[in-house]
Amino acid sequence: MKILIIGPSWVGDMVMSHSLYQQLKQQYPKSQIDVMAPDWCRPLLARMPEVHKAITMPIGHGAFRLMERYQIGKSLRNQYDLAIVLPNSFKSAFIPFFARIAHRRGWKGESRYCLLNDLRTNKNDYPMMVQRYVALAFEATQVPKPDDLPIAFPYLQTQADEIAQTKAKFAQKLTATENRPLIGFCPGAEFGPAKRWPHYHYAKLAEILIEKGFAICLFGSKKDQIIAEQIRLGLAEHSQRYCINLAGQTDLNQAVDLIADCRAIVSNDSGLMHIAAALNKPKPLVALYGPTSPSYTPPLSKQAVIIRLIDGGLIKIRKGEAKEGYHQSLIDITPDRVVQELNQLLAC
């Protein structure tokens, strides 16, 4: 069986989709799984052994461009037996429809009745995103109940020689850590500061860990450079040499390798958090949640500890009450609490 997946457009969602690919291989061992996704996803898909081929989706997130979708779909005709559409948007279902793939499966989303012929409507029965993904591996009449759904955690393959090569590219920066074990911080998050643990808490945590003999490596995209530098500059001058700001200086592939080299990770609810959770050699991970809900998109790792001080589901907010836009529930998570959780994880 040849299967086309229309993949998600976010790092964390792409990582979690690996659970679906594993389940498809369990059910159809000889299947060929191709994933259409944005080009930046290739480094992640290359680390998922179940994926046969990554197909670049040239249309940007949010763009409609119907005729281009038609041409892409037409180019894929007579190649696939099954299509699974992971995004909920109406437009994401066009390419399998135009490709005339016989079986087109996905959740109802934006009322895609005319485009998908295996439309699932009971999404609320599966509260976790990874459950919704894995449920699509099954025929409509054979989907297990949520508690019985087999969930294989995502795992991104890493190789010691590739990690060493990546470290060599950043050797000049990393030598400043004087061979101290690294703790990685992922201080960024999409959709504004309400999802971020305050930079001054990260700085205090870094001071404590540096005193304990660790070094700190800050990861993130170019958008996270300023917040990461605020953390570094928040340290005492003699401690700054042990805090390396790599935000915006790595590509996604390099970030995976360098995160894999860390002794542990502290992260906001972000794509990098899901990457840290999904390494094939799991790392101790402290995941910090505020208004977003770990009951929907938790880090899928037995080495992860979640800290969240409020109950309930998602709170739709992009800016918190504090001056910097931080959410009070994240402000209330103290560095000492994070140190306590890290100590327990590192002792295991």
Curated annotation (Swiss-Prot):
Disruption phenotype: Mutant synthesizes a truncated LOS molecule and becomes attenuated in an animal model for experimental chancroid. It comes from the Bacteria. It catalyses: an L-alpha-D-Hep-(1->5)-[alpha-Kdo-(2->4)]-alpha-Kdo-(2->6)-lipid A + ADP-L-glycero-beta-D-manno-heptose = an L-alpha-D-Hep-(1->3)-L-alpha-D-Hep-(1->5)-[alpha-Kdo-(2->4)]-alpha-Kdo-(2->6)-lipid A + ADP + H(+). Keywords: Glycosyltransferase, Transferase. One of its GO terms (cellular component) is cytosol. GO terms for molecular function: ADP-heptose-lipopolysaccharide heptosyltransferase activity. Transmembrane segments: none annotated. Its EC number is 2.4.99.24. Pathway: Bacterial outer membrane biogenesis; LOS core biosynthesis. Pfam families: Glyco_transf_9. Can complement a S.typhimurium mutant lacking waaF. Glycosyltransferase involved in the biosynthesis of the core oligosaccharide region of lipooligosaccharide (LOS). Catalyzes the addition of a heptose unit to the heptosyl-Kdo2-lipid A module. This is Lipooligosaccharide heptosyltransferase 2. The gene is waaF.
